[in-house]
């Protein structure tokens, strides 16, 4: 699943560690989601969307 997480994080000038702190996950988890190696759980996807005041669909989209 593709996502805009890296762009959204960069717009706020946050490091991966800072974003991880906001989400209560590890920096490695943020990196795995940003690079598409891992899809977030549904609760985490909602948390990410809320953090950026967006819908899940605005942050994440299917690769198809």
Language-model segments: residues:
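Recognition helix of helix-turn-helix/homeodomain-like DNA-binding domains
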Residues: 25-38
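DNA major-groove recognition helix of helix-turn-helix/homeodomain DNA-binding modules
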Residues: 43-58
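Residues in the recognition helix of alpha-helical DNA-binding motifs
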Residues: 8, 22-23, 33, 62
